[in-house]
């Protein structure tokens, strides 16, 4: 803890609860039992957790720079170099084009100029991907566009950590007791999900004391 000269608390550590998602062998087992796919089972679990959080007044972390508008359309929330990097990450676009065929160069250009709707469709089912890309997150059509985007956000965060297969991805921070209780009660139907704790720094009247504590 940090105090001022009068003993008033300026900053302290606060313990909060987080919800995490990671790959689990249970998804493969469920897929075999239900005649589905691992992606289908992952999406089901993520959807259930997001609805639990929303129902209890908590929010989930959305790291994908696409938003759903009130008119039912999609748009990017980033521009310039940030948006270009996002598209490169999504489509796996490298900077070297010397070994690409003409058709591959055309596809590369199309992907770099993809609209929010096109990126969404690619992540949902692989549309506009290169040969052999597959169905990406294979998000079932039963989910609305808005819900599919929410599922996609969690899957995309896990996708960025794909080279560390069992690395946890944080879905939500600072969840309340209602969400904690419901997730724990339904743990048997939520493989790959766990609740953890972490310490965050809290600053009292941070603007007034930032010059003192370097915040």
Regions found by a protein language model. Name each.
Residues 1-215:
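Membrane-proximal periplasmic segments of bacterial cell-envelope enzymes
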């Amino acid at each position: 803890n940090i105090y001022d000269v009068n003993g008033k608390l300026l900053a302290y550590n606060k313990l909060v609860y987080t919800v995490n998602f990671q790959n689990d062998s249970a998804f493969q087992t469920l897929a075999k039992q239900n005649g589905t796919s691992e992606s289908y089972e992952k999406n089901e679990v993520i959807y259930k957790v997001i609805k639990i959080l929303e129902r209890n007044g908590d929010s989930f972390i959305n790291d994908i720079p696409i938003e759903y508008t009130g008119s039912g359309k999609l748009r990017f929330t980033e521009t310039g170099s940030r948006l270009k990097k996002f598209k490169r990450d999504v489509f796996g676009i490298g900077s070297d084009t010397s070994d690409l065929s003409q058709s591959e160069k055309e596809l590369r250009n199309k992907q770099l100029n993809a609209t929010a709707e096109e990126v969404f469709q690619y992540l949902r089912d692989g549309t506009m991907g290169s040969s052999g890309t597959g169905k990406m997150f294979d998000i079932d059509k039963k989910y609305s566009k808005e819900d599919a985007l929410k599922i996609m956000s969690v899957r995309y965060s896990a996708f960025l950590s794909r080279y560390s297969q069992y690395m946890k991805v944080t879905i939500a921070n600072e969840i309340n007791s209602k969400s904690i209780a419901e997730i724990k009660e339904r743990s048997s139907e939520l493989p790959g999900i766990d609740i953890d704790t972490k310490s965050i720094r809290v600053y009292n009247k941070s603007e007034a004391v930032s010059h003192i504590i370097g915040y």
